[in-house]
Amino acid sequence: MTIAFYPGSFDPMTNGHLDVLIQALNVASKVIVAVGIHPGKAPLFSFDERAALISRALSETLPGEAARVEVVSFDNLVVDAARQHGAHLLLRGLRDGTDLDYEMQMAGMNRQMAPDIQTVFLPAGTSSRPITATLVRQIAAMGGNVDAFVPKAVLEALNAKLKR
């Protein structure tokens, strides 16, 4: 069984994240979506909320694939968390050259620390390239329409959280 580890903050999950997750299911038997918990950061959604939104978005988009996805939290090094879950693939989505430069540096460091874990880059689809969770939060907080950038479940949760 090929287990892939897909880390991120997913605050909130965007269509870009979902695009990468769908691609990941084509290269791995199981995908661990790992929500990073960072002390000092104040996320919009709690871990439990993010986990539920990821699961709902996946079930709305690919019903029947939920059994192949597990959502976990982690607060340690990505490679250590991947090992704890038996993953040998580390998945990273790429939107542009800036992402590539950063992710290549991270992949090199991860390779030094964990030569048994291979980083796999998955390119974002054309429609999801400009999307970031930070921009989604900012646009939504200012009353903008983000329905083209997030799954339906996330849109509903954003509207409820921001009382719109």
From Swiss-Prot:
EC number: 2.7.7.3
Entry binding sites for substrate: 9, 41, 78, 92
GO cellular component, as recorded: cytoplasm
Annotated site location: Transition state stabilizer: 17
SUPFAM superfamilies (UniProt xref): Nucleotidylyl transferase (SSF52374)
Domain of life: Bacteria
Gene Ontology MF, one: pantetheine-phosphate adenylyltransferase activity
Subcellular location, record wording: Cytoplasm
Gene Ontology BP, a term: coenzyme A biosynthetic process
Chief localisation class: cytoplasm
Function text: Reversibly transfers an adenylyl group from ATP to 4'-phosphopantetheine, yielding dephospho-CoA (dPCoA) and pyrophosphate.
Assembly with partners or alone: Homohexamer.
NCBIfam families per record: coaD_prev_kdtB, cyt_tran_rel
Annotated protein name in UniProt: Phosphopantetheine adenylyltransferase
Gene: coaD
